[in-house]
Protein backbone atom coordinates (compact mmCIF):
# COMPACT_ATOMS: atom_id res chain seq x y z
CA UNK A 1 0.00 0.00 0.00
CA UNK A 2 1.30 3.44 -0.92
CA UNK A 3 1.86 6.05 1.76
CA UNK A 4 -0.92 8.30 0.43
CA UNK A 5 -3.42 5.43 0.59
CA UNK A 6 -2.29 4.60 4.12
CA UNK A 7 -2.63 8.24 5.20
CA UNK A 8 -6.16 8.38 3.82
CA UNK A 9 -6.95 5.11 5.58
CA UNK A 10 -5.64 6.44 8.90
CA UNK A 11 -7.75 9.59 8.61
CA UNK A 12 -10.84 7.51 7.82
CA UNK A 13 -10.29 5.24 10.83
CA UNK A 14 -9.82 8.24 13.12
CA UNK A 15 -13.04 9.77 11.78
CA UNK A 16 -14.93 6.53 12.42
CA UNK A 17 -13.59 5.85 15.92
CA UNK A 18 -12.67 9.28 17.27
CA UNK A 19 -9.39 7.86 18.58
CA UNK A 20 -7.17 5.07 17.26
CA UNK A 21 -4.06 3.58 18.87
CA UNK A 22 -0.70 3.02 17.20
CA UNK A 23 -1.04 -0.72 17.84
CA UNK A 24 -4.39 -0.84 16.02
CA UNK A 25 -2.91 0.95 13.03
CA UNK A 26 0.13 -1.35 12.92
CA UNK A 27 -2.15 -4.37 12.84
CA UNK A 28 -4.62 -2.85 10.39
CA UNK A 29 -2.01 -1.81 7.80
CA UNK A 30 0.53 -4.60 8.50
CA UNK A 31 3.45 -2.20 8.78
CA UNK A 32 6.01 -1.45 11.48
CA UNK A 33 5.35 0.83 14.48
CA UNK A 34 8.05 3.16 13.16
CA UNK A 35 6.17 3.56 9.86
CA UNK A 36 2.91 4.37 11.65
CA UNK A 37 4.64 6.89 13.91
CA UNK A 38 6.08 8.66 10.86
CA UNK A 39 2.64 8.65 9.24
CA UNK A 40 1.02 10.13 12.34
CA UNK A 41 3.68 12.80 12.69
CA UNK A 42 3.23 13.85 9.05
CA UNK A 43 -0.56 13.96 9.36
CA UNK A 44 -0.31 15.94 12.59
CA UNK A 45 1.98 18.49 10.90
CA UNK A 46 -0.78 19.01 8.31
CA UNK A 47 -3.34 19.41 11.14
CA UNK A 48 -5.32 16.45 9.80
CA UNK A 49 -5.11 14.62 13.13
CA UNK A 50 -4.03 15.42 16.67
CA UNK A 51 -1.08 13.28 17.76
CA UNK A 52 -1.26 11.57 21.14
CA UNK A 53 1.28 9.38 22.90
CA UNK A 54 0.19 5.96 21.70
CA UNK A 55 -2.27 7.06 19.03
CA UNK A 56 -4.17 9.84 17.31
CA UNK A 57 -7.55 11.59 17.27
CA UNK A 58 -9.38 14.18 15.22
CA UNK A 59 -8.50 17.75 16.27
CA UNK A 60 -12.22 18.57 16.64
CA UNK A 61 -12.80 15.63 19.00
CA UNK A 62 -9.64 16.01 21.06
CA UNK A 63 -9.57 19.63 22.14
CA UNK A 64 -12.58 21.52 23.42
CA UNK A 65 -13.42 25.04 22.30
CA UNK A 66 -11.81 27.60 24.66
CA UNK A 67 -13.95 28.43 27.70
CA UNK A 68 -14.32 32.14 26.84
CA UNK A 69 -15.62 31.23 23.37
CA UNK A 70 -18.09 28.69 24.80
CA UNK A 71 -19.22 31.22 27.40
CA UNK A 72 -20.11 33.67 24.63
CA UNK A 73 -22.07 31.22 22.45
CA UNK A 74 -25.75 30.21 22.74
CA UNK A 75 -26.09 32.58 25.71
CA UNK A 76 -29.83 33.17 25.31
CA UNK A 77 -30.48 29.44 24.96
CA UNK A 78 -28.40 28.66 28.04
CA UNK A 79 -30.26 31.28 30.06
CA UNK A 80 -33.64 29.79 29.07
CA UNK A 81 -32.44 26.32 30.03
CA UNK A 82 -31.06 27.64 33.32
CA UNK A 83 -34.31 29.40 34.26
CA UNK A 84 -36.33 26.25 33.59
CA UNK A 85 -33.99 24.11 35.69
CA UNK A 86 -34.04 26.65 38.53
CA UNK A 87 -37.85 26.44 38.60
CA UNK A 88 -37.55 22.74 39.44
CA UNK A 89 -35.17 23.24 42.39
CA UNK A 90 -37.01 23.85 45.70
CA UNK A 91 -35.53 26.15 48.32
CA UNK A 92 -33.49 24.20 50.85
CA UNK A 93 -32.35 21.59 48.31
CA UNK A 94 -28.95 19.94 48.09
CA UNK A 95 -27.29 19.70 44.69
CA UNK A 96 -24.16 19.09 42.68
CA UNK A 97 -23.26 21.59 39.96
CA UNK A 98 -20.86 20.33 37.30
CA UNK A 99 -18.16 21.86 35.09
CA UNK A 100 -19.43 23.71 32.00
CA UNK A 101 -20.90 26.99 30.84
CA UNK A 102 -24.52 25.76 30.95
CA UNK A 103 -24.22 24.53 34.57
CA UNK A 104 -22.67 27.94 35.30
CA UNK A 105 -25.78 29.58 33.81
CA UNK A 106 -27.89 27.44 36.16
CA UNK A 107 -25.84 28.75 39.09
CA UNK A 108 -26.73 32.33 38.08
CA UNK A 109 -30.41 31.38 37.83
CA UNK A 110 -30.35 30.03 41.40
CA UNK A 111 -29.36 33.34 42.99
CA UNK A 112 -32.99 34.10 43.91
CA UNK A 113 -33.28 30.83 45.85
CA UNK A 114 -32.70 30.45 49.57
CA UNK A 115 -30.90 27.98 51.83
CA UNK A 116 -29.36 25.85 49.11
CA UNK A 117 -26.46 23.52 49.89
CA UNK A 118 -24.27 23.09 46.84
CA UNK A 119 -21.30 20.84 46.13
CA UNK A 120 -19.34 21.83 43.03
CA UNK A 121 -16.09 21.12 41.23
CA UNK A 122 -16.45 24.35 39.26
CA UNK A 123 -14.62 27.40 40.60
CA UNK A 124 -16.77 29.73 38.48
CA UNK A 125 -19.92 28.33 40.10
CA UNK A 126 -18.48 28.85 43.58
CA UNK A 127 -17.54 32.45 42.73
CA UNK A 128 -21.06 33.13 41.43
CA UNK A 129 -22.87 31.67 44.44
CA UNK A 130 -20.61 32.90 47.24
CA UNK A 131 -22.52 36.21 47.36
CA UNK A 132 -25.47 34.36 48.93
CA UNK A 133 -24.91 34.30 52.67
CA UNK A 134 -27.68 31.74 53.23
CA UNK A 135 -26.14 29.28 50.75
CA UNK A 136 -23.66 26.67 51.88
CA UNK A 137 -21.06 26.20 49.13
CA UNK A 138 -18.79 23.15 49.35
CA UNK A 139 -15.92 23.25 46.84
CA UNK A 140 -14.32 19.95 45.85
CA UNK A 141 -10.59 19.52 46.18
CA UNK A 142 -8.39 18.34 43.33
CA UNK A 143 -6.47 19.71 40.37
CA UNK A 144 -7.65 23.12 39.13
CA UNK A 145 -7.81 23.55 35.35
CA UNK A 146 -6.89 27.16 34.79
CA UNK A 147 -8.46 27.21 31.33
CA UNK A 148 -12.04 26.84 32.61
CA UNK A 149 -12.07 26.72 36.42
CA UNK A 150 -12.87 23.00 36.53
CA UNK A 151 -11.55 20.83 39.35
CA UNK A 152 -10.72 17.20 38.52
CA UNK A 153 -8.64 14.25 39.71
CA UNK A 154 -8.69 11.42 42.22
CA UNK A 155 -9.21 13.79 45.16
CA UNK A 156 -12.29 15.22 43.42
CA UNK A 157 -13.75 11.75 42.93
CA UNK A 158 -13.16 10.78 46.55
CA UNK A 159 -14.72 14.05 47.73
CA UNK A 160 -17.87 13.80 45.60
CA UNK A 161 -18.41 10.18 46.62
CA UNK A 162 -18.90 11.25 50.25
CA UNK A 163 -22.23 12.94 49.43
CA UNK A 164 -25.76 11.91 48.47
CA UNK A 165 -27.63 14.97 47.19
CA UNK A 166 -31.09 15.77 45.83
CA UNK A 167 -30.07 17.00 42.37
CA UNK A 168 -27.13 16.71 40.00
CA UNK A 169 -26.81 19.48 37.39
CA UNK A 170 -24.72 17.97 34.62
CA UNK A 171 -23.24 19.43 31.44
CA UNK A 172 -21.74 17.50 28.52
CA UNK A 173 -19.59 18.37 25.49
CA UNK A 174 -21.36 16.24 22.91
CA UNK A 175 -24.19 13.75 22.36
CA UNK A 176 -23.84 11.14 19.61
CA UNK A 177 -26.71 9.97 17.42
CA UNK A 178 -27.14 6.83 19.55
CA UNK A 179 -27.44 8.86 22.76
CA UNK A 180 -23.84 8.38 23.89
CA UNK A 181 -22.59 11.20 26.13
CA UNK A 182 -19.18 12.41 24.96
CA UNK A 183 -16.42 14.39 26.65
CA UNK A 184 -12.90 15.58 25.90
CA UNK A 185 -11.21 14.73 29.21
CA UNK A 186 -11.22 11.25 30.72
CA UNK A 187 -10.73 12.67 34.22
CA UNK A 188 -13.79 14.88 33.78
CA UNK A 189 -15.83 11.86 32.64
CA UNK A 190 -15.02 10.03 35.86
CA UNK A 191 -16.13 13.05 37.88
CA UNK A 192 -19.42 13.29 35.97
CA UNK A 193 -20.10 9.61 36.59
CA UNK A 194 -19.54 10.18 40.31
CA UNK A 195 -22.06 13.03 40.25
CA UNK A 196 -24.61 10.78 38.54
CA UNK A 197 -24.06 7.96 41.03
CA UNK A 198 -24.48 10.26 44.02
CA UNK A 199 -27.51 12.31 42.88
CA UNK A 200 -31.12 11.31 43.43
CA UNK A 201 -32.25 13.18 40.31
CA UNK A 202 -29.85 14.00 37.46
CA UNK A 203 -30.62 16.92 35.14
CA UNK A 204 -28.62 17.07 31.91
CA UNK A 205 -28.43 20.67 30.65
CA UNK A 206 -27.42 21.07 26.99
CA UNK A 207 -28.10 23.53 24.19
CA UNK A 208 -28.88 22.21 20.71
CA UNK A 209 -25.28 22.57 19.46
CA UNK A 210 -24.21 19.58 21.58
CA UNK A 211 -26.30 17.11 19.56
CA UNK A 212 -24.07 15.47 16.95
CA UNK A 213 -20.93 17.10 18.34
CA UNK A 214 -17.93 14.77 18.56
CA UNK A 215 -15.60 14.21 21.51
CA UNK A 216 -13.24 11.31 22.05
CA UNK A 217 -14.28 9.92 25.47
CA UNK A 218 -17.56 8.00 25.78
CA UNK A 219 -19.08 8.57 29.21
CA UNK A 220 -22.04 6.23 28.68
CA UNK A 221 -25.64 6.49 27.57
CA UNK A 222 -27.98 9.43 28.00
CA UNK A 223 -30.26 6.88 29.70
CA UNK A 224 -28.15 7.40 32.86
CA UNK A 225 -29.84 10.76 33.52
CA UNK A 226 -33.38 11.44 34.71
CA UNK A 227 -34.18 14.56 32.68
CA UNK A 228 -32.80 16.47 29.69
CA UNK A 229 -33.18 20.25 29.46
CA UNK A 230 -32.47 21.73 26.04
CA UNK A 231 -33.64 24.51 23.74
CA UNK A 232 -34.64 22.49 20.65
CA UNK A 233 -35.92 18.98 19.90
CA UNK A 234 -33.10 16.41 19.79
CA UNK A 235 -32.50 14.28 16.67
CA UNK A 236 -35.01 11.48 16.11
CA UNK A 237 -32.53 8.78 17.11
CA UNK A 238 -31.82 10.48 20.45
CA UNK A 239 -35.53 11.06 21.01
CA UNK A 240 -36.06 7.33 20.62
CA UNK A 241 -33.52 6.60 23.36
CA UNK A 242 -35.23 9.10 25.67
CA UNK A 243 -38.62 7.52 24.98
CA UNK A 244 -37.36 3.95 25.41
CA UNK A 245 -35.85 4.76 28.80
CA UNK A 246 -38.61 7.11 30.01
CA UNK A 247 -36.25 10.08 30.27
CA UNK A 248 -38.04 13.40 30.86
CA UNK A 249 -37.45 15.97 28.09
CA UNK A 250 -37.92 19.69 28.78
CA UNK A 251 -37.76 22.09 25.83
CA UNK A 252 -36.86 25.54 27.10
UniProtKB/Swiss-Prot annotation:
SUPFAM superfamilies given in the database record: NagB/RpiA/CoA transferase-like, Winged helix' DNA-binding domain
InterPro entries linked to this entry: Carb_Metab_HTH_regulators (IPR050313), DeoR-like_C (IPR014036), DeoR_HTH (IPR001034), NagB/RpiA_transferase-like (IPR037171), Tscrpt_reg_HTH_DeoR_CS (IPR018356), WH-like_DNA-bd_sf (IPR036388), WH_DNA-bd_sf (IPR036390)
PROSITE patterns xref list: HTH_DEOR_1 (PS00894), HTH_DEOR_2 (PS51000)
Domain HTH deoR-type: 3-58
GO molecular function: cis-regulatory region sequence-specific DNA binding; ligand-modulated transcription factor activity
Keywords attached to this entry: DNA-binding, Glycerol metabolism, Repressor, Transcription, Transcription regulation
Protein name: Glycerol-3-phosphate regulon repressor
Record organism: Escherichia coli (strain K12)
Lineage of producing organism: Bacteria, Pseudomonadati, Pseudomonadota, Gammaproteobacteria, Enterobacterales
Amino acid sequence: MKQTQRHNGIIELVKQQGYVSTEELVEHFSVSPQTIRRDLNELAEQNLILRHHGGAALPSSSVNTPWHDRKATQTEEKERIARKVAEQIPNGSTLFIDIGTTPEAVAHALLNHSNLRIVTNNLNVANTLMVKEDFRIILAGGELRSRDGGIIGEATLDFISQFRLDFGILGISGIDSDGSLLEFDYHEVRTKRAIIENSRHVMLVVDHSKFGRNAMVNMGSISMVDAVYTDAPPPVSVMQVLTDHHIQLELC
